[in-house]
Amino acid sequence: MRDIDAALEKRARAMRRDMTKAERRLWRHMRQRLPLERTHFRRQLVIGAAIVDFACVANKLIIEVDGAQHGEDEARAYDDARTQALVADGWRVLRFWNFQVMDEIDSVIETIAAVIEGRL
């Protein structure tokens, strides 16, 4: 059984209820357009000390949707350290900016599908 901090799990549940517009858009498109086998994604999943936006456990694939605040130096350093920890644990992390999800959703979905299918 996983030992998850109760406060972190509670926060993840709240984040699932209050996703950003970009997260909702990506979630809808992933559910509609990605192949069903090997692509069961979970939203706002607790992995270690992190809450990731989307994760496909079977593929050890994490999808993060980043807003403008992630472009700040401090946030970028935090994201880099967090990504390194997840990668060290065997995960592959894909990051997309909000504007990519909102304006280039076909490209985003194609990139995710290519990773799942082993083309990237």
Where are these regions (language model features)?
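Nucleic-acid endo/exonuclease domains
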Residues: 1-95, 99-120
